């Protein structure tokens, strides 16, 4: 179930302030954030945002196709190394 249209999209206040500040100055800097739940807004297009995946910050370049999605969708939290070669149960 999605978020109510009446409420609008969620975005961390600190992240929104940083984006607006960079848009006003015209700078292109990497913005570090831990807010994976923030929705990508049209103001963010063209910026690189480093999203925390639990271990490190993954740089995400925001494009127009990403608008409306969450930042956490583009920073995977799990790394699959593959099943063990001798483990026949897992490969079945």
Curated annotation (Swiss-Prot):
One of its GO biological process terms is: translation
The keyword Ribonucleoprotein appears for this protein: yes
Molecular function as annotated in GO:
rRNA binding; structural constituent of ribosome
> Using the chain's own numbering, where are the disulfide bonds?
none
Name the protein family.
Answer: Belongs to the universal ribosomal protein uS19 family.
Q: What does this protein do?
A: Protein S19 forms a complex with S13 that binds strongly to the 16S ribosomal RNA.
Q: What is this protein called?
A: Small ribosomal subunit protein uS19
> Gene of origin?
rpsS
């Amino acid at each position: 179930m999605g978020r109510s249209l009446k409420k609008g999209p969620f975005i961390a206040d600190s992240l929104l302030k940083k984006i607006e500040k960079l848009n006003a100055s015209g700078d292109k800097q990497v913005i570090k954030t831990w807010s994976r739940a923030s929705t990508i807004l049209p103001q963010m297009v063209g910026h690189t945002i480093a999203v925390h995946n639990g271990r490190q910050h993954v740089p995400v370049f925001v494009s127009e196709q990403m608008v409306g999605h969450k930042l956490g969708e583009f920073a995977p939290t799990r790394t699959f190394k593959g099943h063990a070669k001798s483990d026949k149960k897992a490969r079945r």
